[in-house]
Design a protein with these regions (language model features):
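Class I S-adenosyl-L-methionine
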Residues: 2-7, 80, 86, 98-187
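Short helix-capping segments at alpha-helix termini
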Residues: 39-41, 63-69, 110-113
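Short SAM/SAH-binding signature in class I
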Residues: 86-94
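S-adenosyl-L-methionine
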Residues: 1-20, 34, 52, 56-84
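Conserved SAM-binding motif I beta-strand of class I
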Residues: 44-49
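Conserved class I S-adenosyl-L-methionine
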Residues: 19-28
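Conserved SAM-binding loop of SAM-dependent methyltransferases across substrates and taxa
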Residues: 29-42
Length: 187
């Protein structure tokens, strides 16, 4: 049985580039990994986590969804489980903004024009993640406020352009949420 995603993971899945391999870093329970693998829209789906326990849960989720044969699970720290050019999108959901940018900093190949799309759902400090992305040459190609379990999350997609920007406080706080109808209650 295919797992049900909450609103934030559903929004993240919608921002993954179709037709290209994808990695779900910090896959935890493997729900997003399973939904991506079952969709048939990606030639390769990789679920990775730092600890064996979550990977065992992810394996069980994939087995229950009937798509274990369409995903690959890897044990490792952040993006060290990937090689440059291996995926077109990387999902980083459920970790803090600081952890997100620390993961990105450890993989310089991500900061290259034409590199992978980063799909991020920071658990905390989304405004600081926006600032970090802009100050390090990334452009936000999507930025959506999503409510799940009674709280608001920022679901973002960024691609490296090399163009460094110094954003305002308001840009960091709200991003592009003014473009989305659900943005009214976001801040």
């Amino acid at each position: 049985m295919l797992p049900t995603l909450d609103a934030r993971l559903t929004a993240a899945a919608q921002l993954v580039r179709p037709g290209q391999p994808v990695a779900d870093i910090g896959c935890d329970h493997g729900k997003l990994t399973a939904v991506l693998a079952a969709s048939g829209r990606y030639p390769k789906v990789i679920g990775a986590d730092l600890r064996p326990g979550p990977l065992a849960k992810a394996k069980q989720t994939l087995e229950n969804a009937g798509c274990l044969d369409r995903a690959e699970l890897r044990l490792g720290d952040g993006l060290s489980v990937l090689s440059a050019g291996e995926v077109g999108s990387i999902v980083l959901a459920g970790v803090s903004a600081q952890t997100t940018w620390e993961i990105i900093e450890k993989a310089p190949w991500v900061s290259a024009v034409g590199g992978p799309r980063l799909v991020m759902v920071p658990a905390t400090r989304h405004s600081e993640l926006r600032r970090w992305l802009w100050q390090h040459g990334f452009a936000l190609v999507a930025d959506r406020p999503v409510q799940a379990a009674g709280r608001w999350y920022a679901v973002m997609a960024a691609e490296y352009t090399g163009e460094v920007t110094e954003p305002t406080f308001t840009q960091c706080l709200l991003g592009d949420t003014g473009r989305w109808p659900e943005g009214a209650g976001y801040a």
